[in-house]
């Protein structure tokens, strides 16, 4: 079984992999990093005009990193908007994924947080820098192989 976007991508010869449906009936697609920018533009043109959320996670220690996009197709007069979840997996050594900031502006802080916590670089993001951790922080705190330092410097508020 395929969702609407998946069927449309197949019809137009665009490479992806369906990972199935979640408990709400939302299809999850896997897209390669090198195909993500073009498929993101196509998704927007297809009608997915709202990036509900973007997050990232570490799949396994020493394994891949994943950037996850929850897209919604909002239309006037439609009670139940169409949704899709897209996962883009990147290698741990040099995790690079095209930014979708220029397509969905709501990706700005979300991609920055994924960069800050997991070290995924989002190509062509206008302000890709740490957002939660100090610029001097070494490492990526949400990676499963991250070793937390045994000391923290407490800074004054003034």
UniProtKB/Swiss-Prot annotation:
Alphabetized InterPro entries for the sequence: NADH_DH_suC, NADH_quin_OxRdtase_su_C/D-like, NADH_UbQ_OxRdtase_30kDa_su, NADH_UbQ_OxRdtase_CS
UniProt cross-references to PROSITE patterns, sorted A to Z: COMPLEX1_30K (PS00542)
GO MF: NADH dehydrogenase (ubiquinone) activity; quinone binding
Topology of the protein relative to the lipid bilayer: Peripheral membrane protein
Localization of this protein: Plastid, Chloroplast thylakoid membrane
Cross-referenced Pfam families: Complex1_30kDa
Enzyme class: translocase
Gene3D superfamilies the record matches: NADH:ubiquinone oxidoreductase, 30kDa subunit
E.C. numbers: 7.1.1.-
Biological function: NDH shuttles electrons from NAD(P)H:plastoquinone, via FMN and iron-sulfur (Fe-S) centers, to quinones in the photosynthetic chain and possibly in a chloroplast respiratory chain. The immediate electron acceptor for the enzyme in this species is believed to be plastoquinone. Couples the redox reaction to proton translocation, and thus conserves the redox energy in a proton gradient.
Similarity comment: family membership: Belongs to the complex I 30 kDa subunit family.
HAMAP family named among the record's database cross-references: NDH1_NuoC
Listed name of the protein: NAD(P)H-quinone oxidoreductase subunit J, chloroplastic
Protein's organism: Nandina domestica (Heavenly bamboo)
Lineage: Eukaryota, Viridiplantae, Streptophyta, Embryophyta, Tracheophyta
Gene: ndhJ
